[in-house]
Amino acid sequence: MKFSGKALVLFCLASLGACSRQEPATPPASSAPPAAVQPAPTPPAADKAPVELSPELVARLERPHSPVLGAAKGRVTVVEVLDPACEACRAYAPVVEQLLFLYPEDVRVVVRFADFHPPSQEAIRLLEASRQQGKFHQVLEALFERQSEWASHSAPDASRAWKIASDAGVDVAKARKAANADGVSKMLALESEDLVALKVERTPTFFVNGKLLVDFGPKQLFALVKEEAGKTAQ
């Protein structure tokens, strides 16, 4: 994916937020007594504060096999739990890229996997095999860009993901062998164990410097990253 700076993140924030922004319907004039006193509107609920994890859970956020994007030694670690077949994860990909663009020296993004959709496990195996060839980021981007080709709701077909990986430069014969190795099966089991311990039930889920982002939204993610970056700069 190619992104174009600050204009892109404004577009992403607006488009993602629009999905949850609903105006209350205006009732017909006859639905309320003419003299009824209308109650004051309920103020919007305040954002829920991020939840700081225990040291035991923080230790589960990152594993030696976890792919890392951005600054390898960044002061702010964003852990994203994603499902490559998840449409919301695809929608958040430009948001994550924008974080890396805005904080090139400070932010490192650690990727963890969930297989909540039928074709996801094979795609995760493919991504791990691609990581071993140094092609993780390229393949993840390609799988998101062409998600409808292999992860449609009506006819999911993970085998098509291999063609997408090949187009991204992966040696597919080598990757197929690596994807079916015992080590990858153990990796998938550990991913599942960690997600259960961390109580991850949706994708994407974000943790920033050991804090769970409770409220789901790009605005909240950017705010928490900015806050943590400010702390580490002091």
Predicted regions and their residues:
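Sec-dependent bacterial lipoprotein signal peptides
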Residues: 1-17
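Extracytoplasmic thiol/disulfide redox context detector
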Residues: 2, 19-118, 191-192, 230-234
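C-terminal cap of thioredoxin/glutaredoxin-like
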Residues: 2-3, 20-34, 162-234
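Processing junctions and N-termini across compartments
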Residues: 13, 80-83, 200
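Loop/turn elements at helix/coil->beta-strand transitions in domains of secreted/extracellular proteins
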Residues: 75-77, 104-108, 133-138, 170-172, ...
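Soluble non-cytosolic domains of exported or imported proteins
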Residues: 76, 87-90, 117-121, 130-134, ...
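Solvent-exposed loop/turn segments at secondary-structure junctions
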Residues: 84-87, 114-119, 145-150, 181-184, ...
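Structural microenvironment flanking redox-active thiols in thiol-disulfide oxidoreductases
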Residues: 102-165
